[in-house]
């Protein structure tokens, strides 16, 4: 038996369980530890029986509860090395100085300087090779923005993620900042190279998205193949090849193009979502389903639907029309993954 349960899918958090009788893998941990535990129990999955967490990429909606959950359950996490490093950078607390804070600090320093005794014999002026000499004032160093949590959200959360909500439920809040990125065990994999966890063979494949080293997955066990491909700007040839002959196909149907273009997002965000490293639209998925899709899957799960720029009815209608236009594909069942509650388990 191979079973797939989508715990959550969308711009606010993503997580899926792929399991057999002896092995259970969590794909992404994009909800808080508290919420992940709640949804695992609601879906009939025992969290204590998870054998590991595999990560697609480091955006917040895929890793929010990762560290706390992994430590609580004492299970390994599987990343690409680049994704792990990007996640560590994102999780590491940084002191960020706004321009207003810098001005306030400069004012305080100027006041202190005016009260301090001045030496009677002043030294030379700044040298010619220095265009500006800062005398006793703190320098303002703008810092890089933290990686945005998801391509589909116009607002970026600055700084490291909050852990207090999880800490109250799953563990004590770490006192040492290094604890934020401590994991029980880390296993690296490479896109295109298979690896095994228990009796599940995992094939990661590269996908086009604005992250460090994003991947999709095909999980195979007992002759059954389950594919997960979300957060991709378009379906590249390697992804199309990986998705062939899969019994379950979980694939992105993120936005309706008209809703996105007419919606409230800033134009820069709209461009990013529609770019080749953004998210797959209903229209782009329909083109794949009518063209390169082999019709093999018993179930097609539409995932990562935008709450702002899509409607479940639009996504389902678009996919069903695409599938219904080809006679060999009439046996495909279309399901919608939800943000607020787990999807009914798919058992093969």
Language model features by range: what are they?
Residues 33-84:
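Active-site metal-binding motif and surrounding structural segment of the metallo-beta-lactamase
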Residues 50, 183, 246-247:
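Short, well-ordered alpha-helix to beta-strand connector turns
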Residues 332-348:
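Short, basic/aromatic-enriched C-terminal tail that caps enzymatic domains
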Residues 1-43, 215-230, 248:
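Conserved beta-strand hairpin/beta-sheet module of binuclear metal-dependent hydrolase folds
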């Amino acid at each position: 038996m191979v079973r797939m349960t989508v715990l959550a899918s969308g711009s606010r958090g993503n997580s899926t369980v792929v399991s057999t009788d002896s092995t259970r893998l969590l794909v992404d941990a994009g909800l808080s530890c508290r919420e992940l535990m709640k949804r695992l129990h609601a879906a009939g999955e025992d969290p204590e029986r998870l054998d590991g967490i595999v990560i697609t990429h480091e955006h917040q909606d895929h890793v929010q509860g990762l560290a706390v959950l992994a430590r609580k359950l004492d299970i390994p996490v599987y990343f690409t090395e680049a994704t792990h490093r990007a996640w560590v950078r994102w999780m590491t607390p940084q002191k960020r100085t706004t321009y207003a804070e810098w001005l306030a600090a400069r004012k305080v320093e100027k006041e202190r300087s005016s009260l301090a005794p001045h030496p009677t014999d002043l030294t030379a002026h700044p040298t010619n090779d220095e265009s500006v000499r800062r005398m006793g004032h703190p320098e303002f160093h703008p810092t890089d923005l933290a990686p945005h949590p998801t391509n589909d959200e116009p607002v970026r959360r600055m700084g490291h993620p909050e852990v207090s909500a999880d800490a109250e439920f799953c563990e004590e809040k770490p006192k040492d900042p290094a604890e934020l990125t401590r994991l029980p065990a880390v296993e690296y994999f490479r896109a295109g190279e298979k690896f095994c966890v228990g009796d599940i063979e995992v094939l990661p494949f590269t996908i086009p998205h604005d992250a460090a080293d994003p991947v999709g997955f095909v999980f195979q066990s007992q002759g059954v193949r389950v594919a997960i491909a979300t957060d991709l700007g378009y379906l590249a040839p390697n992804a199309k090849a990986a998705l062939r002959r899969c019994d379950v196909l979980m694939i992105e149907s993120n936005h309706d193009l008209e809703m996105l273009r007419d919606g409230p997002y800033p134009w820069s965000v709209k461009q990013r979502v529609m770019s080749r490293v953004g998210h797959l639209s209903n229209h782009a998925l329909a083109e794949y389903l009518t063209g390169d899709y082999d019709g093999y899957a018993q179930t097609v799960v539409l995932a990562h639907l935008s709450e702002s720029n899509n409607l479940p009815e639009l996504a389902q209608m678009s996919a069903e029309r695409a599938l219904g236009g080809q006679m060999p594909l009439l046996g495909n069942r279309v399901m919608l993954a939800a943000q607020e509650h787990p999807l009914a388990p798919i058992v093969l």
